[in-house]
Amino acid sequence: MRDPIEWPTTDLVTHRVSATPDRTATVAVGGDETTYRELDAAVGAVAAALDRRTDSTDPTVAVLLPTRPEVGTLLFAAMRLGATLAPLNVELDAATLRAQCATVEADLLVCAASTRDLAAEAATCPVVSVEDLPVQPDGAGADRETEVTPATLSRTDTQLVVFTSGTTSEPKGVRLTVGNLVASAVASSYRLGVLPTDRWLVCLPTYHMGGLAPFVRSALYGTAVVVQRSFDADATRQAIAEYGVTGVSLVPTMLSRLLDAGWEPPSSLRFVLLGGGPASEPLVERCRERGVPVCPTYGMTETASQIATARPETAFEHAGTVGQPLVFTDVTVVADGEPCDPGERGEIVVDGPTVTPGYLGGAGASFGEFGFRTGDLGYRDADGRLWVEGRVDDRIVTGGENVDASTVAGVIRDHSAVEDAAVVGLPDEEWGQRVAALVVGDVTPAAVREHGAERLAAYEVPKTVRTADALPRTPSGTVDREAVRSRLSAGDSGTERPE
């Protein structure tokens, strides 16, 4: 494991503006462009405004904003002030948000006009609207206070608290340090490459790392972030073309919708970073046929985003891989406490400078001899490429037999009429658990079981099959397995239940 140098010493915009002040920093789709000189002025003014509104010497600023450029301004203002930023999910209910504000011990909650009422109900601290902060580079907004002296940073300082998606459990507040963020940005750019003219489109929520990471990468390298407030297949493909976008982060559902809409990527697009869930082989093949430079990636909040990423040529040549681990990142596949040989499946364990120091609020991170235990199952080949095959706790034990949920889901997805599938175990009085599948596509439960019987052992074939218009997902795009389990248990999809 190798660490990058002990840097930065102050916020990234302070460093960046001294090098390339007139380069474009942010672009709002349908709005204005901002240079790094202008962003630096806004960051300084906002940092002073936050300082005036908080009493703590190391405050935590919670943010309840939809995706917009001001999230980046607030991130760097917090960094300049020496504060911690805690972006909150605007889709959550007030009670959950109140609990998260308490967990992070927020000193101030920044909202938008669209989230003002929710913020007032959820807040455990004073609330200020972003419209009342000097976020605009031209001075629009509230009075501009005297700028603060940039805080001296250490790589161990907690910069962000980001809550997990809650795919398999309650969301946990992940501490991410200055060093975590910079190491992640360096490693990502080392794998993908970076050009001075790069423009990265952000259309993912900025309360998850997929939406936040491009701001850090761009400030580090002096490139631009193009911000779209929400994903829409037609509007997003138009933005990619109109704004000269060279990279974009998407989840599989978004990419599928773009392709379904007939999208042909422009030659300027160099990377489609695809994460938040498994990239199916048919989806990657569609990308190859359309000339989409897809980069399947594996990452998590606890590692400040990417762990491993496949470049397009690797993704096309080695079906299902997420590529080799990024620079600085050590990945060990472990079974029974020992590293696995190539091709042997086990739990994916990650170590390196991108890994969180831990969670807030007493939630324990699982660290072992080889690093952070992700809870994900996978394997590596002899060249170090990684495949991710589901969760350790996705194992279903039915009648004493072990069933791998991801394997069953993969077989179901191979059916020509199936668009997507999720498989979980449901309680069963006779067998302990039974295999259950929620399926998206124009297919009957009987056809799914018949297809499964041709490729799976009898105990692996789903006994419960329901269809749905879409799989329930968390805001970050990952399958919400608890919601899948609830839907299969309750039968709320309105489709038949097998005998």
Where are these regions (language model features)?
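Conserved pre-ATP/AMP-binding loop-to-beta segment of ANL
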Residues: 4-9, 21-24, 143-163, 168-172, ...
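Conserved AMP-binding/adenylate-forming core of the ANL superfamily
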Residues: 5-9, 22-54, 62-68, 72, ...
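Conserved AMP-binding A3 loop
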Residues: 33-37, 152, 156-186, 480
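Conserved ATP-dependent adenylate/AMP-binding module captured primarily in the ANL superfamily
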Residues: 92-121, 135-137, 184-201, 232-246
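ANL superfamily adenylate-forming
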Residues: 114-156, 170
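Conserved AMP-binding/adenylation subdomain of ANL enzymes
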Residues: 184-199, 206-247, 252, 257-262
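Conserved AMP-binding/adenylate-forming
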Residues: 270-271, 279-295, 302-386, 392-395, ...
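AMP-binding/adenylate-forming catalytic core of the ANL superfamily
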Residues: 352, 357-358, 377-460, 470, ...
